[in-house]
Curated annotation (Swiss-Prot):
Keywords from the UniProt entry: Amino-acid biosynthesis, Arginine biosynthesis, ATP-binding, Cytoplasm, Ligase, Nucleotide-binding
Protein name, as recorded: Argininosuccinate synthase
Organism: Nocardioides sp. (strain ATCC BAA-499 / JS614)
Record EC number: 6.3.4.5
Annotated L-aspartate binding sites: 131, 135-136
Pathway: Amino-acid biosynthesis; L-arginine biosynthesis; L-arginine from L-ornithine and carbamoyl phosphate: step 2/3
Binding site for ATP: 17-25, 43, 129, 131, 136, 194
UniProt keyword ATP-binding, yes or no: yes
Amino acid sequence: MSKVLTSLPVGQRVGIAFSGGLDTSVAVAWMRDKGAIPCTYTADIGQYDEPDVSGVPARAREYGAEIARVVDCRAQLVEEGLAALACGAFHIRSGGRIYFNTTPLGRAVTGTILVRAMHEDGVDIWGDGSTFKGNDIERFYRYGLLANPQLRIYKPWLDPDFVHELGGRTEMSQWLTSHGLPYRDSQEKAYSTDANIWGATHEAKTLEHLDTSLEVVTPIMGVRFWDPAVDIATEDVTVAFEQGRPVALNGRRFDDPVELVEEANAIGGRHGLGMSDQIENRIIEAKSRGVYEAPGMALLWLTYERLMNAIHNEDTLANYQISGRRLGRLLYEGRWLDPQALMLRESIQRWVASVVTGEVTVRLRRGEDYTIVRTEGPALSYHPEKLSMERTSNSAFGPTDRIGQLTMRNLDIADSRAMLEMYAGQPLDQGQVLVENGTLFGELPSGGFDQITENPEVQAEPEEEALDAAAMEAGTD
């Protein structure tokens, strides 16, 4: 049975995730005018595009909201963001830059916390401003139902009556004026913006065209680092981590993680750090483009990743990257709280993040131009004396040890050579073109692989005696 209502539930309370912009303002007024009982819920997620969240409920009541609440979600959002940071839950990379999934993080928090707040008020119908072409409609749908299985969804933008009457911004503003209602006549931008404490998203309109650069965007969390007229002073920043969590910046310890993130944003923002231009695959597998800001997350990530690489071995890091990428896609799809995501999160935080303790100092200049100055911690597996090119008194191994290690490699090198010879003997259209003409080997005469593992000292022995000599005296292996 569908949970989506396609017509206005007259006489019933309808919760609206209310931003105070034109779209949600007219939606509240229109629903009240048509006989529904709108109730507005505004999430305080530290958004940088709304300087006065506390004043939003008063505006909502002007448009007819029976209940108008601000719900502080900053602490929960910061915690989820720190979990994503620890897990490397970032799967989108374009032009050499990472997208830190800041919008999906915000949706995971608002989609659950707001629905819980509505349910406390006896509101079990929810609407928001997401369109049918985007990701948010599915993210909110999933999180909403997980938080309240009784929830039904009503979105004015999926209601033919609403769309027919108020299909565009001009019609919306005219409708409010004709009904004697105010609205914020903000200047029309060349793109749309959505923000929270972790980052800002700029998309749509002119940014849909790939011949329009990132530089048309006016940053709201940072500076125009590409503009030579903007003066940016070089700055050294030290970030301290304990068990995978950032705890201090420049020696100042933060008891409140929200304050730490705000300070990280301020530091990274004044250098233009963490701004990226991404082409991504939406949940429905259609490609879209967004310009993102995440100065604090970028600062925390580059220092966390540096420390992690100094601690964990190659296979752990490889598993971390694979699992983190998968987790990032789950987060993007609105599955951050699903069992498959929780399994990955718990594993990564337990076995990788829990030992990431230490400090990294980075010298920030403009944008992504920075230098790592110092890395230290109590559990680093980086020990320069083990591989020093200078003479050391406590070297971990010597020349003879390395000769033995190289000799053991003969086994798999011989196997690889045998396979290459086999491929080279295949018809041209199967193997020879690739192996002989597509690599550096040239011709590969058969039989070379046997020479790799030959032992001159046992060449005179019969085959059976040689096998006996190589066998274990007891047991099997």
